[in-house]
Design a protein with these regions (language model features):
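RNA-binding basic/glycine-rich loop and surface signature characteristic of RAMP-family CRISPR effectors
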Residues: 1-114, 121-187
């Protein structure tokens, strides 16, 4: 099987929240933290988040690729080898340095749940969500495994369409509230 590495760049356009949840939010603390590397403590984008979102968009919005092609690229229930391998995407070096020296921090967005009938905030409805701010850049790679040149071209076309769909959608949680607009480029 032939392997090809593609470089991926993801620019955050609006606050990005890919969370881990919190079973013990502290008073005044973050209810919904972003996922961070356990060693560096820096935010990252799990490969599974990108893979799942791209696959979902292709399955629901693409008219160019059928289920069989999508399953071959992303995997199916029969444990056949996938054509696309998504690595975790880390901060670019510039932003990694900025996070480490404190010039870029995650942002805390406070939200409330409104009672539409009364027009007031619900009791215990205050939430604080951690986000990666706009203009932060992540970099990483996607690996394409191909049987032959035609298979490689098909998977590159499928990935290209999926990225176009995601660039017009959102990544992570709370997209309907404006979170997670990203610009993905692949070389």
């Amino acid at each position: 099987m032939k392997k090809k590495k593609l470089s991926v760049k993801i620019e955050v356009l609006t606050g990005l929240h890919i969370g881990i949840g919190s079973d013990k939010p502290e008073i005044g603390g973050i209810d919904n933290p972003v996922i961070k590397d356990p060693i560096s403590k820096l935010p990252y984008i799990p490969g599974s988040s990108i893979k799942g979102k791209l696959r979902s968009l292709l399955e629901t919005e693409s008219t160019n690729f059928n289920k069989k092609v999508i399953d071959a690229a992303f995997g199916d229930d029969e444990n056949t080898p996938t054509r696309l391998i998504f690595r975790d995407i880390s901060l670019c070096e510039k932003d990694k340095n900025a996070f480490n020296n404190g010039s870029i921090l995650t942002e805390a967005k406070t939200e409330i749940k409104m009672n539409r009938k009364t027009g007031t905030a619900e009791n215990t409805a205050l939430r604080v969500t951690e986000r990666v701010p706009a203009q932060v850049v992540f970099e990483g790679e996607i690996l394409i495994r191909s049987i032959d040149d035609d298979d490689e071209k098909l998977n590159e076309a499928l990935l290209s369409e999926a990225v176009k769909l995601l660039n017009n959608d959102y990544l992570g949680g709370s997209g309907s509230r404006g979170y997670g607009a990203v610009l993905i480029t692949i070389n």
